[in-house]
Amino acid sequence: PFTFKPRQRPVFSDSRSGSVINGSNPTAERLGQQSYGISLYGFARCQRGRPKSNEDYKDVKFSIGCMGKCKRNIEQPGVLETTLKQMCATDCRDDDSSDASGPLDAALLGSLDSSRDHKPDKPVRRNSS
């Protein structure tokens, strides 16, 4: 009863993992993280805050996709529309609805770009719950 249309083209591609931030994610292993521009899993992840360590690397990327695309999708009709709008207003601030336009998004993307040099237990920037 509630699905998002799959994106035609990925926005950010990641050659290291074979996944994309705002499109289908062929390497995803968790339910709800496959070929939706924004999935319910992505919204839940965004609302809960960033993962605590780089072991959830794929989830970090998915959260960025959530924040970047949030307002673009909240007008989709569906049972959870009000809930999604609340999540977006709280956790996905992005005034002009473009990717990585906010300070948090930019900081997270910068962190991901250099993450290959980080130790596995290096803390990842996250929202306070």
Swiss-Prot record:
Residues 14-28 have a biased composition (Polar residues). Residues 99-113 have a biased composition (Low complexity). Residues 1-28, 91-129 are annotated as: Disordered. Coiled coil: none annotated. Residues 114-129 have a biased composition (Basic and acidic residues). One of its GO terms (biological process) is viral translational frameshifting. Disruption phenotype: Knockout mutants display an attenuated small-plaque phenotype. This is Protein 2B*.
